[in-house]
Structure formats: structure tokens, C-alpha cells
């Protein structure tokens, strides 16, 4: 009886696997036009260097590529003009002087054809871009960043020395 149950279960799993191997593995899993919002979705997955624009059916409309030595810095926005503004960081960050949650390093503007129009890097011993940024109506970018303050400066500004971890303070700045 146990063999019959095992065989039946194995057959069901095999059939389910065959059905899944033919389904779309990227994009939309379920689509109800009555519940969907018109437009596209920008996807910038963590630890993958590319950003994808998909339609409501999950079909890829456009891809912006980055080299394999880069990883997302947690933010990407599409402008009304079709420019992609995204943040990224080196894939290997262990040697970076500042590393904390939400770490970025570069904010970059790219055209629809993936040409870099501009970039801004903050990733040194005094500061590192944080996880997000905002585009203003004037076309400028506001970004939050980690700021390293050494113990002498922190104490001079009123910080309790007992609360300084590793002899420094990480603050934030715009």
C-alpha cells in the first residue's frame, strides 16, 4: 500500500512539474484585467545587475543592462522622458570603507538605449550613498547618504563618548 501511495504521489509531482516547466517564469503569474492598473512595471531585482520594464501580461518591454560587477543600490525610477535613473554598487563591497544596510554607491541616468548620460558616485571613507533618492520637479536629485564622523568631531558636537561604537559615528545627510 505504501508503494502505491508513493507511486501515485510521484506521478502527481511529475505532472505538476511538467506543467510548470512550460509556464512563464518571469513576469506575471496571475492577471485579471479588471484589477490591473494600466501601464508598465519597472523591476530592479536585488543582486541582479539589470532593470526590466514589463507590461501587465509579464512580457518584457525593455531591459537596461549593467555589467556583472555591479549590483542594485535599491532604487530605480523611470522618468516621463524614458530615462532610467538608478542606483548601484560594486558587487564586491567587502573592501568599501563604509558599509551598512541600504548601501548604494552610484546614482546614474541612462537613456532608453542604455547610454550613460551622467553619474554621481559617493563611496569613500567619509560618505556613502544610502538606499534611496528622489527626483525633484526641477530635475535635480536628492539623495540620502551615510556620513562617517570620527570620535573627536562627534564628541566636540556633543555626542556621549560611551555611545560611540568603534570610535566613530555614522550619521545621515542629504
Which role fits each region the language model picked out?
Residues 1-6:
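Positively charged n-region of N-terminal signal peptides that target proteins for export
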Residues 7-17:
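Bacterial N-terminal signal peptides
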Residues 20-174:
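Histidine-/acidic-rich catalytic cores in large beta-rich domains
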Amino acid at each position: 500500500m505504501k508503494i502505491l501511495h508513493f507511486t501515485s504521489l510521484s506521478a502527481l509531482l511529475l505532472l505538476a512539474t511538467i506543467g510548470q516547466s512550460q509556464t512563464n517564469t518571469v513576469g506575471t503569474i496571475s492577471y485579471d484585467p479588471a484589477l490591473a492598473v494600466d501601464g508598465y512595471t519597472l523591476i530592479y531585482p536585488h543582486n541582479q545587475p539589470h532593470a526590466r520594464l514589463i507590461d501587465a501580461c509579464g512580457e518584457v518591454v525593455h531591459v537596461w543592462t549593467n555589467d556583472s560587477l555591479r549590483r542594485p543600490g535599491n532604487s530605480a525610477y523611470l522618468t516621463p522622458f524614458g530615462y532610467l535613473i538608478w542606483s548601484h554598487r560594486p558587487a564586491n563591497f567587502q573592501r568599501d570603507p563604509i558599509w551598512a544596510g541600504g548601501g548604494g554607491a552610484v546614482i546614474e541616468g541612462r537613456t532608453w538605449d542604455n547610454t550613460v548620460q551622467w553619474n554621481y558616485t559617493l563611496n569613500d571613507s567619509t560618505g556613502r550613498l544610502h538606499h534611496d533618492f528622489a527626483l525633484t520637479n526641477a530635475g535635480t536629485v536628492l539623495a540620502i547618504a551615510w556620513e562617517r564622523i570620527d570620535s573627536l568631531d562627534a564628541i566636540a558636537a556633543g555626542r556621549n563618548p560611551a555611545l560611540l561604537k568603534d570610535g566613530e559615528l555614522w550619521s545621515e545627510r542629504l
